[in-house]
Amino acid sequence: MNEATEAWPKFKVLFATDGDSAEIITDILTGTDTNAFIYSVLHNCYIYPTEVKIVLILCLPAKKPGGGDKCLEVFQLHIDTELAIPFLFYTKPLKANDLHKYIDFKAARKNFKPILDIISTNKPSPKTHNSDIKSKIVWFRAKFVNSLRKLYKISSSPYWMITTFGSFEVPFLLTAIFYFFEQHNCTINTIFHLSSLFEKKLGTSLIAITTFEELGGVCSTSDYLKTAPAFINYCHIKLARDSLESQAIDTSIDTLRGQLMLSNQDLVHYIYLSFFQCLNKDIFIKYSHLTNSDNIHFVPETEVLAQSLDENFRKDMLTYYNKSTYLKTYITHKCIHLPDLIGYAPQDCTSFVYWAGQSKNVHNLLNVINTTHPHINISEDLNGLLDLAAIDSTFNVDNLKDCVFNESQKVPVYRCEFLNKTYFVIVQNDILKNVWSTDVLMPMQENWYMLKDTEITSNISYKETFTSMLTLRDQLKISRHEYFNPRLPVFNLVLDLDLHIHTSEHEIDEIYNLCCTLRSLILETLQLLGPVDIDTHHVYFFKSTCEKPENWIDNKELKFCYCTKKLGFRIITPLPAGVVLLGSNPVISFVNILNRTIKIDKKLLAMYPLIMETDGPFDVGIYHKGRCVRIPHTYKVNSSGRLERLLKLFVCHPHVDNKLQYVMDSFDINNLLYHSHNPEKVKQLKAVYDIADTNENFILQKAQAQLPQTNHNAVERIESASHMSITDWVAEFAWPRLFELIKLYLSEEKVSQFYHVSFAASTGNIIKIISLSGNFSCLNFKHRLKTQSVRIFLSLHLTPDNCVTLTLMSQCFASKCNSNKCIAHMSVRVPITDK
């Protein structure tokens, strides 16, 4: 292309042909005679050019444009203006046979050589000059034509363009011009919306257009073609403004998000709510009016949409997702003061007195008690055993446990695995304190209790056992689980921690830092219930032991912990003095609050980011009736009887120099059970029966409140609007219409079973159809074995315009019908109050 040609104005033309465009393009390139015509459908020459010659770039829509050009060049025509004007503005087509006079074949080679290089790879081809593409196209014509179909969106009908860009002249013209001829990253819907803001008039309808020639005639002669430059300018201004507003919203959201510790779910809800506040329907309509073509130049320079973010919502987010303000602002509890609340009887550890049995033995024991004490009437299962364990002689003259123990007192219930059998155990007097004093060796150093916490932990030695004992009595000394008993007050908070991790080697200092952080969080949360001395209050940590890695070498120094997926701890701490929890609900609520406190602690999240992917590290399921948890210093028994995961003491009492009392208390069974009675006698105990997070799930509830509200109860809506029962309404209004469809689409054999039916309301929006002349047969198949298990019913669905869509459904239990899978057959739409 010489310098003179470079100076000619260039215009893009979206063209069509009166035949197969791929074949016609190939004919033109190969010089094959053709009678085809080329039509201008759309172009970006908005006024008559004044130059003598111009360059027309003939284009076709890209089949898969992605983020690239929406139309791709096919030919460049160097053509006289007097020939181009009728083609562009007066629907006069160009003959395909004449195009070779105007085509820039150098540009054509540049366009099509990459295609030819690909399809001719490793294929024999004519030995011609590299610049001669005509011979290659002739040689590989079929593949070349197929490649054009994959590259360009080729269609003989303009229907796809009309349905895509609009069925009226003005929005179609403006939307299509900007979409095809301008550089942008917009969806068609966005451009269509911009066209409606630019021009309210719609122009003529395009519904009746059937050919590209007709469509090109409308676009080329449209009076609105000359407004395209103004529309393009408006689009660029509007999109720049939208980008400014969007960036301001993102900045506002990200600024607040950076201050909050949000789970993935909460983050999604927060972003949704924030965008909803800025871009809900009302605000979007106002903003669209503010930025239409008449007002766009008068919009304030400052951002508009970001100002819609609700300050109260921001305040709620900042306080709810901040640890200190969360605990002070949103946590409440209800309590009463009760005298003489007691838990388990203190264990003097002088003798081992217990009863043990399997489920059948539990049943027999409780049956005997119900027989001898009929007024007690307890269930003869585990729940009954828990009820029995919670009864003492305070309010009963009789000793209900007289067939087991000499005296009646409140006792713990344990579970023990022995010889692949589960035993339920009630213990009146325990000896675990004595057992642990012999099986656990304190550090050998003089004044060991003055050492650092980690040094004491490293020097405490357990006499470990790896296989189950020979007797149940001995097995109870090394493995048992305490059942949570909701009939007894809770004196000690027992926590089961499963902390998900992504590393496999942990030094003792890392674990200690974790324990110190958890201790601080637990005590800070406990202060909600009563006064706690942060320095001296005992919080016991028992870490589940982990095995050495399989590839460990003997001469390699061992790390303290090799846990891979999660760290397991049992954490136990007494409640504040004079405070008890009643039942499982306040315990569950408290632990849920503790979980949330952990999830918004930045220090802990920095150490263990996987916390955000769960509901929290503390298991709340262990506090339900019938659930149990392994007590400290004991083993888990696996299916083969092997003992594993011993819960060893991990000392964490950082603010007291002398750890003796702390360590000794951690081996006292009276300090380690849910319902162990506090030895300090308090006349009036503060009994907490309800703990609540007043703003729990507020972000989820707020998000749900913004979703479109629909009335899902169709039956209730129908009955209230029609003043009829649902069965009468179906029989009078809906069934006659549906029955006409049934007669139209089902065979007479199937239809006959619907002549005599009645209706019955079922659950949800389901109406059962009951045959009065026998059972229904399958509506899909004629089974060889006539099944009597066919269910026919109607499903009701409300529509926004006060109508109901009734769908005839069936279920057949035959295997050929996918064994009871629901099948929809036909639907009819019925107004609620109009026949």
Swiss-Prot record:
Main EC class the enzyme belongs to: transferase
Compartments it resides in: Host nucleus
A Pfam match: Herpes_UL52
GO biological process: bidirectional double-stranded viral DNA replication; DNA replication
Keyword Zinc-finger carried by entry: yes
Principal location: host cell
Annotated zinc fingers (CHC2-type), start-end: 778-817
Matches recorded under InterPro entries: HSV_PRIM (IPR033685)
EC number(s) given by UniProt: 2.7.7.-
Free-text function comment from the UniProt entry: Essential component of the helicase/primase complex. Unwinds the DNA at the replication forks and generates single-stranded DNA for both leading and lagging strand synthesis. The primase initiates primer synthesis and thereby produces large amount of short RNA primers on the lagging strand that the polymerase elongates using dNTPs.
Quaternary structure annotation from Swiss-Prot or TrEMBL: Associates with the helicase and the primase-associated factor to form the helicase-primase factor.
Family: Belongs to the herpesviridae DNA primase family.
Protein name: DNA primase
Organism: Saimiriine herpesvirus 2 (strain 11)
Taxonomic path: Viruses, Duplodnaviria, Heunggongvirae, Peploviricota, Herviviricetes
Gene behind the chain: 56
